[in-house]
């Protein structure tokens, strides 16, 4: 088991889409559909460096939320739980050409077609200039069996660096 409760880890490993929420300059939440990638400790997202206001929003306020609510958005069996992870995000942009590549194996595992696109990356060079978003989970809410008719099971995470 990694840093998160097992049901949350299962959802993060299998979900193809999540709702990633940042706070805009006015303090209002702004939500983006994103592919969640999980390495057993941190949650990773990635974003093009072009036209990405979400990166500026994270730098201004690192408090974020990642919700996975679409039980059918997987390659295999439907998800059995809905999950929201609240935490702190950091934008890692040391080198937009290579820094994000450390999550490439996770991305390919989730979306095998990415391997084919990556092989043809010279055709879309600006698409592959990416920033890495690293989320340190602080709190996890789990709705067992996906039912929102009951309150979620809440896990406050301690000892997560």
Where are these regions (language model features)?
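Short, basic/aromatic recognition patches
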Residues: 1-19
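Short beta-strand segments
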Residues: 15-50, 56, 66-70, 77-80
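Active-site-adjacent structural patch at catalytic or cofactor/ligand-binding sites
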Residues: 61-71, 81-90
């Amino acid at each position: 088991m990694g840093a998160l409760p097992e049901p949350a880890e299962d959802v993060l490993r299998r979900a193809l889409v999540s709702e990633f929420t940042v706070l805009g300059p006015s303090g209002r939440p702004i939500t983006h559909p994103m592919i969640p990638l999980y390495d057993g400790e941190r949650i990773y997202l990635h974003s093009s460096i072009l036209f990405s206001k979400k990166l500026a929003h994270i730098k201004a306020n690192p408090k974020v939320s990642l919700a996975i609510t679409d039980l059918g958005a997987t390659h295999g069996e439907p998800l059995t739980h809905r999950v929201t992870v609240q935490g702190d995000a950091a934008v890692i942009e040391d080198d937009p050409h290579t820094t994000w590549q450390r999550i490439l194996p996770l991305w390919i595992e989730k979306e095998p077609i990415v391997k084919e696109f990556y092989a043809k990356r010279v055709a879309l060079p600006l698409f592959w200039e990416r920033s890495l978003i690293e989320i340190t989970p602080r709190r996890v809410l789990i709705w067992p069996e996906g039912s929102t008719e009951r309150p979620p099971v809440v896990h406050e995470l301690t000892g997560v660096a």
